Swiss-Prot record:
Record GO terms (molecular function): ATP binding; homoserine kinase activity
This protein's encoding gene: thrB
Organism per entry: Desulfitobacterium hafniense (strain Y51)
A GO cellular component entry from the record: cytoplasm
Compartmental location: Cytoplasm
Biological role: Catalyzes the ATP-dependent phosphorylation of L-homoserine to L-homoserine phosphate.
Protein name: Homoserine kinase
Residues given in the record as ATP binding sites: P85, P86, T87, R88, G89, M90, G91, S92, S93, S94, A95
Gene Ontology BP, a term: threonine biosynthetic process
UniProt KW keywords: Amino-acid biosynthesis, ATP-binding, Cytoplasm, Kinase, Nucleotide-binding, Threonine biosynthesis, Transferase
Listed Pfam families: GHMP_kinases_C (PF08544), GHMP_kinases_N (PF00288)
Reactions performed catalytically: L-homoserine + ATP = O-phospho-L-homoserine + ADP + H(+)
Amino acid sequence: MVRVRIPATSANLGPGFDCLGMALSLYNVVQIEAADSFQIALKGDYTAGIPGDETNLVWQSMCNLWEAIGFEIPTVSLELENNIPPTRGMGSSSAAIVGGLVAANEYAGGVLSKQQILQIANRIEGHPDNVAPALLGGVTLAVTAEASVIARTVHSQPQFMALAIVPDFYLSTEKSRNVLPASISRADAVYNLSRTALLVEALIHENHELLKEGMQDRLHQNQRAGLVPGLGETLQVALDSGAYGSALSGSGPTILALVSSHRAEQVSQAMVDSLAAHGLTAKAYLLSVDSEGAAVI
């Protein structure tokens, strides 16, 4: 039997569109063991809409890895514990992909390194900013160079908490990407480039005073504001209430705030109240940054 724990992730971190992501201490668990017949058991906080057959993304990812290494696809049973909210901008699909790949690799004898697994994960997901932190942990910077991904951990465990405010509605990545323009201005490109560099500096040196400006973005948040009622106001409310920085998590609708532990409650309440004023209910998760990434447990 193999059990793997996979963290939630917040990608597009601040200005780091499609390149910066953060692993969070909210986990899915994948368990695989030999069986007489194929079956999938679902458990956890979020099971609705998760396929219990061969179309399941965890299983498809497993088969992808086994085929890549020439390992005969075995007859197994899977138990999938889903605690990461799906289609909310917290990396549920990346957790499924990475969990499936890591579990399959371990089941086959651990023949691939994490860097090799990352390449397969990126091919399945299509972009590396969620799969990299899900696999490696911490805050990661990932870029695609020709046909491969280069990923490095910027900071494994920053000294702040991550407050994830999760509105009670689904928002698919496809729908969220469709509102983005095909081209951007030079000014906006420079704006995000400079703030991405500033954010990396702030993270490496634990300079929390730089996070407010370092988390600013012009490439996707304003463009997606129409999909998340009250987004702009709630991002500002987080800062006004004492957060170091705030951003849309992934493609949304979750909103992320980086906070100190002693200000987390007031920031959380202010953000939930802000969304409520726009007719949305939301659940707050106070999380730490996961430093390990996907792990066999």
